[in-house]
Protein backbone atom coordinates (compact mmCIF):
# COMPACT_ATOMS: atom_id res chain seq x y z
CA UNK A 1 0.00 0.00 0.00
CA UNK A 2 2.82 2.39 0.90
CA UNK A 3 4.51 1.95 -2.48
CA UNK A 4 1.21 2.75 -4.18
CA UNK A 5 0.92 5.92 -2.10
CA UNK A 6 4.45 6.95 -3.05
CA UNK A 7 3.58 6.72 -6.76
CA UNK A 8 0.08 8.18 -6.55
CA UNK A 9 1.13 11.85 -6.97
CA UNK A 10 3.16 10.89 -10.04
CA UNK A 11 0.19 9.05 -11.57
CA UNK A 12 -2.08 12.02 -10.81
CA UNK A 13 0.48 14.42 -12.36
CA UNK A 14 0.64 12.33 -15.54
CA UNK A 15 -3.14 11.95 -15.83
CA UNK A 16 -3.76 15.68 -15.38
CA UNK A 17 -1.00 16.50 -17.86
CA UNK A 18 -2.57 14.23 -20.48
CA UNK A 19 -6.09 15.53 -19.81
CA UNK A 20 -5.29 19.21 -19.36
CA UNK A 21 -1.84 20.84 -19.29
CA UNK A 22 1.32 21.25 -17.23
CA UNK A 23 -0.30 23.80 -14.92
CA UNK A 24 -3.28 21.61 -14.06
CA UNK A 25 -0.85 18.73 -13.60
CA UNK A 26 1.30 20.83 -11.27
CA UNK A 27 -1.74 21.84 -9.20
CA UNK A 28 -2.85 18.22 -9.01
CA UNK A 29 0.67 17.14 -8.02
CA UNK A 30 0.73 19.60 -5.11
CA UNK A 31 -2.70 18.49 -3.89
CA UNK A 32 -1.99 14.76 -4.33
CA UNK A 33 1.34 15.03 -2.52
CA UNK A 34 -0.34 16.87 0.37
CA UNK A 35 -3.11 14.26 0.55
CA UNK A 36 -0.57 11.41 0.64
CA UNK A 37 1.36 13.20 3.40
CA UNK A 38 -1.80 13.76 5.45
CA UNK A 39 -2.92 10.16 4.89
CA UNK A 40 0.49 8.87 6.01
CA UNK A 41 0.25 10.91 9.19
CA UNK A 42 -3.31 9.80 9.95
CA UNK A 43 -2.69 6.13 9.08
CA UNK A 44 0.85 5.58 10.39
CA UNK A 45 1.39 8.57 12.72
CA UNK A 46 4.67 9.08 10.93
CA UNK A 47 5.97 11.13 8.02
CA UNK A 48 9.28 10.11 6.50
CA UNK A 49 11.88 12.84 6.04
CA UNK A 50 12.17 12.13 2.33
CA UNK A 51 8.40 12.48 1.89
CA UNK A 52 8.37 15.77 3.79
CA UNK A 53 11.31 17.17 1.80
CA UNK A 54 9.65 16.08 -1.43
CA UNK A 55 6.39 17.77 -0.42
CA UNK A 56 8.14 21.03 0.46
CA UNK A 57 9.95 21.05 -2.89
CA UNK A 58 6.76 20.16 -4.77
CA UNK A 59 4.91 22.97 -2.99
CA UNK A 60 7.67 25.54 -3.55
CA UNK A 61 8.56 24.70 -7.15
CA UNK A 62 4.96 23.92 -8.04
CA UNK A 63 3.81 27.15 -6.43
CA UNK A 64 6.40 29.13 -8.39
CA UNK A 65 5.33 27.36 -11.58
CA UNK A 66 1.72 28.37 -11.00
CA UNK A 67 2.43 31.89 -9.73
CA UNK A 68 4.71 32.83 -12.63
CA UNK A 69 2.92 30.56 -15.12
CA UNK A 70 6.32 29.16 -16.08
CA UNK A 71 6.91 25.41 -16.27
CA UNK A 72 10.68 25.73 -15.79
CA UNK A 73 10.26 25.72 -12.01
CA UNK A 74 8.53 22.33 -11.85
CA UNK A 75 11.14 20.95 -14.25
CA UNK A 76 13.92 22.06 -11.90
CA UNK A 77 12.27 20.32 -8.94
CA UNK A 78 13.38 16.89 -10.14
CA UNK A 79 17.02 17.93 -10.42
CA UNK A 80 16.97 19.72 -7.06
CA UNK A 81 15.54 16.64 -5.32
CA UNK A 82 18.16 14.41 -6.92
CA UNK A 83 20.93 16.87 -6.03
CA UNK A 84 19.76 16.87 -2.40
CA UNK A 85 19.68 13.06 -2.33
CA UNK A 86 23.16 12.84 -3.85
CA UNK A 87 24.45 15.51 -1.48
CA UNK A 88 23.03 13.71 1.56
CA UNK A 89 24.60 10.42 0.45
CA UNK A 90 27.99 11.99 -0.19
CA UNK A 91 27.96 14.02 3.02
CA UNK A 92 27.05 10.96 5.07
CA UNK A 93 30.04 9.12 3.69
CA UNK A 94 32.66 11.87 3.64
CA UNK A 95 31.64 14.05 6.57
CA UNK A 96 29.74 11.76 8.93
CA UNK A 97 31.95 8.78 8.06
CA UNK A 98 29.03 6.35 7.83
CA UNK A 99 27.19 5.92 4.52
CA UNK A 100 23.51 6.81 4.62
CA UNK A 101 22.65 3.53 2.87
CA UNK A 102 24.33 1.70 5.75
CA UNK A 103 22.38 3.75 8.30
CA UNK A 104 19.14 2.82 6.51
CA UNK A 105 19.83 -0.88 5.88
CA UNK A 106 22.68 -1.79 8.23
CA UNK A 107 20.45 -3.34 10.89
CA UNK A 108 18.98 -5.81 8.39
CA UNK A 109 22.10 -6.56 6.34
CA UNK A 110 25.62 -7.47 7.39
CA UNK A 111 27.95 -6.14 4.71
CA UNK A 112 31.60 -5.12 4.77
CA UNK A 113 32.23 -1.38 5.14
CA UNK A 114 33.76 -1.22 1.66
CA UNK A 115 30.53 -2.58 0.11
CA UNK A 116 28.41 -0.02 1.98
CA UNK A 117 30.70 2.74 0.74
CA UNK A 118 30.57 1.54 -2.87
CA UNK A 119 26.79 1.17 -2.76
CA UNK A 120 26.39 4.63 -1.25
CA UNK A 121 28.63 6.20 -3.91
CA UNK A 122 26.82 4.29 -6.66
CA UNK A 123 23.47 5.73 -5.52
CA UNK A 124 24.94 9.23 -5.27
CA UNK A 125 26.28 8.90 -8.81
CA UNK A 126 22.91 7.54 -9.97
CA UNK A 127 21.11 10.60 -8.57
CA UNK A 128 23.66 12.97 -10.12
CA UNK A 129 23.29 11.33 -13.55
CA UNK A 130 19.48 11.37 -13.30
CA UNK A 131 19.52 15.03 -12.28
CA UNK A 132 21.75 15.94 -15.22
CA UNK A 133 19.60 13.87 -17.60
CA UNK A 134 16.56 15.73 -16.29
CA UNK A 135 18.17 19.09 -17.04
CA UNK A 136 18.98 18.04 -20.58
CA UNK A 137 15.58 16.51 -21.32
CA UNK A 138 13.60 19.26 -19.55
CA UNK A 139 15.28 22.16 -21.28
CA UNK A 140 16.34 20.80 -24.67
CA UNK A 141 13.43 18.54 -25.63
CA UNK A 142 9.66 19.11 -25.92
CA UNK A 143 7.61 19.24 -22.74
CA UNK A 144 5.71 16.01 -23.46
CA UNK A 145 8.99 14.10 -23.74
CA UNK A 146 10.10 15.51 -20.39
CA UNK A 147 6.80 14.47 -18.75
CA UNK A 148 7.14 10.93 -20.12
CA UNK A 149 10.78 10.81 -18.99
CA UNK A 150 9.85 12.09 -15.52
CA UNK A 151 7.00 9.62 -15.09
CA UNK A 152 8.24 6.52 -16.90
CA UNK A 153 11.95 6.98 -17.56
CA UNK A 154 13.05 7.98 -14.08
CA UNK A 155 10.72 5.45 -12.47
CA UNK A 156 12.09 2.65 -14.66
CA UNK A 157 15.69 3.73 -14.11
CA UNK A 158 15.16 3.80 -10.34
CA UNK A 159 13.54 0.36 -10.38
CA UNK A 160 16.36 -1.09 -12.48
CA UNK A 161 19.02 0.50 -10.27
CA UNK A 162 17.26 -0.82 -7.16
CA UNK A 163 17.24 -4.34 -8.62
CA UNK A 164 20.92 -4.07 -9.59
CA UNK A 165 21.70 -2.86 -6.07
CA UNK A 166 19.85 -5.87 -4.68
CA UNK A 167 21.93 -8.21 -6.84
CA UNK A 168 25.12 -6.43 -5.75
CA UNK A 169 24.12 -6.71 -2.08
CA UNK A 170 23.19 -10.38 -2.45
CA UNK A 171 26.59 -11.18 -3.99
CA UNK A 172 28.33 -9.72 -0.94
CA UNK A 173 26.15 -11.12 1.83
CA UNK A 174 27.74 -13.67 4.18
CA UNK A 175 26.71 -17.22 3.21
CA UNK A 176 24.42 -17.69 6.24
CA UNK A 177 22.41 -14.55 5.30
CA UNK A 178 21.71 -15.71 1.73
CA UNK A 179 19.16 -18.32 2.72
UniProtKB/Swiss-Prot annotation:
Membrane topology reported for the UniProt record: Multi-pass membrane protein
Main location: membrane
Keywords: Cell inner membrane, Cell membrane, Membrane, Transmembrane, Transmembrane helix
Pfam families associated with the record: IspA
GO cellular component: plasma membrane
Compartment(s) where it occurs, according to its Swiss-Prot or TrEMBL record: Cell inner membrane
Positions of transmembrane segments: 22-42, 50-70, 76-96, 121-141, 149-169
Record function comment: Plays a role in cell envelope biogenesis, maintenance of cell envelope integrity and membrane homeostasis.
Similarity section: Belongs to the YciB family.
Name this polypeptide is given: Inner membrane-spanning protein YciB
